[in-house]
Amino acid sequence: MARYLGPKLKMSRRENIDLFLKSGVRAIDSKCKIEQPPGQHGARKPRLSDYGLQLREKQKVRRIYGILERQFRNYYQEAARLKGNTGESLLQLLESRLDNVVYRMGFGATRAESRQLVSHKAIMVNNHIVNIASYQVAINDKISIRDKAKKQSRIRASLELAEQREKPTWLEVDIVKMEGIFKKIPERIHLSAHINEHMIVELYSK
């Protein structure tokens, strides 16, 4: 499945929740009727079966993290091999992606912008350039902005926006040095309450 390149707000309206695909400069409800499905008149949503609800939940999480279907399935299979709760492990793997950590640290206004920073070689891990968005960040890894990229206005603007968001407890960020430490794997209680990972596990367990 190809990556979706259409209107970002349309996806949030489809899922009836803010997927954090926009920068957050303006509240999403000031841009569109988030509770109203996409379409000229907001077509009524059909009542979904259990399978339909599980599928929608998977699509929602995929869109939040910007993951393609095959890659998402691979993450699930890896999570299933790990000890502990499969759903929680899945979210922890997604949260440990380099593009997501860059976003959480505030260097990118969105995950898509953070992915672009990584692919454009603006990000370093332990003082080495890493341009793979799916790179799995490990505990105590240092994530930093390359010196030549520190003057980018979008990075500075993103850091200002990040000050308005709740700061992740599993990260330590120095906005002056434009670097941060991945202190620990986030616990489920610290991640979005709007995600029902158990439905995804049920979907893939069939």
Curated annotation (Swiss-Prot):
Sorted alphabetically, which keywords does the UniProt record give?
A: Ribonucleoprotein, Ribosomal protein, RNA-binding, rRNA-binding
A GO BP annotation: ribosomal small subunit biogenesis
Q: What is this protein called?
A: Small ribosomal subunit protein uS4
Q: Which domain of life is it from?
A: Bacteria
GO terms for cellular component: small ribosomal subunit
* Disulfide partners: none
Q: What quaternary structure, including any partners, is listed in this protein's UniProt entry?
A: Part of the 30S ribosomal subunit. Contacts protein S5. The interaction surface between S4 and S5 is involved in control of translational fidelity.
- In Gene Ontology terms, what is one molecular function of this protein? structural constituent of ribosome
Gene, per the UniProt record: rpsD
